[in-house]
Swiss-Prot record:
Keyword Repeat among record annotations: yes
Function: Crystallins are the dominant structural components of the vertebrate eye lens.
Gene: CRYBA4
Domain Beta/gamma crystallin 'Greek key': start-end pairs: 12-51, 52-98, 105-146, 147-195
One biological process term in Gene Ontology: camera-type eye development
Record: disease: Cataract 23, multiple types: An opacification of the crystalline lens of the eye that frequently results in visual impairment or blindness. Opacities vary in morphology, are often confined to a portion of the lens, and may be static or progressive. In general, the more posteriorly located and dense an opacity, the greater the impact on visual function. CTRCT23 is a zonular cataract. Zonular or lamellar cataracts are opacities, broad or narrow, usually consisting of powdery white dots affecting only certain layers or zones between the cortex and nucleus of an otherwise clear lens.
Species per Swiss-Prot/TrEMBL record: Homo sapiens
Name of the protein described by the UniProt record: Beta-crystallin A4
Region annotated Connecting peptide, chain positions: 99-104
Record InterPro entries: Beta/Gamma-Crystallin (IPR050252), Beta/gamma_crystallin (IPR001064), G_crystallin-like (IPR011024)
Length: 196
């Protein structure tokens, strides 16, 4: 049985600054922003998420490294990217994370691309897929039945982050390029539900 995604009603709200420590120019968002450059910002260096979950991107047009931004304060780039192997010191586009419903999240992971090979059903957070019995350090494809998830390259939610949502690609991520991997790898070793 496939659960249908119900978009979060929002409202989403985030305040950003162009300098560290909540200093400099400020702007409030309640909807996606494909480029802060259009607002006269060169970059975003600090932010506060007041409601909803957001996805921040290194480059304009929702490109580059992805960072999940949940409710809280991010006084500098290391607060959102300090746990990654190759942190981006700036964010230039944002969008709300749709379908983030922590209680009802469900995801199927597949060993190979195009939903082939061994599979596993997830409905909880896994700081280490290997500890739950997943062989190897790669996932070939995903089907998001419900909710929104963030996958990380390494155990303990470290390394590159990839956001998976049930309303993007119809919840189907057949290949690493569809979930925004920056390296030609299927390496995913930890997965968690996105907090709303």
């Amino acid at each position: 049985m496939t659960l249908q995604c119900t978009k979060s009603a929002g409202p989403w709200k985030m305040v950003v600054w162009d300098e560290d420590g909540f200093q400099g120019r400020r702007h409030e968002f309640t909807a996606e922003c494909p480029s802060v450059l259009e607002l006269g910002f060169e970059t975003v260096r600090s932010l506060k998420v007041l409601s909803g979950a957001w996805v921040g991107f290194e480059h304009a047009g929702f490109q580059g490294q992805q960072y999940i931004l949940e409710r809280g304060e991010y006084p500098s780039w290391d607060a959102w990217g300090g746990n990654t192997a190759y942190p981006a010191e700036r964010l230039t586009s944002f969008r709300p994370a749709a379908c983030a419903n922590h209680r009802d999240s469900r995801l199927t992971i597949f060993e190979q691309e195009n939903f082939l090979g061994k599979k596993g059903e997830l409905s909880d957070d896994y700081p280490s897929l290997q500890a739950m019995g997943w062989e190897g350090n790669e996932v070939g494809s995903f089907h998001v039945h419900s909710g929104a998830w963030v996958c990380s390259q390494f155990p303990g939610y470290r390394g590159f982050q990839y956001v998976l949502e049930c309303d993007h690609h119809s919840g189907d991520y057949k290949h690493f390029r569809e979930w925004g991997s920056h390296a030609p790898t299927f390496q995913v070793q930890s997965i968690r539900r996105i907090q709303q």
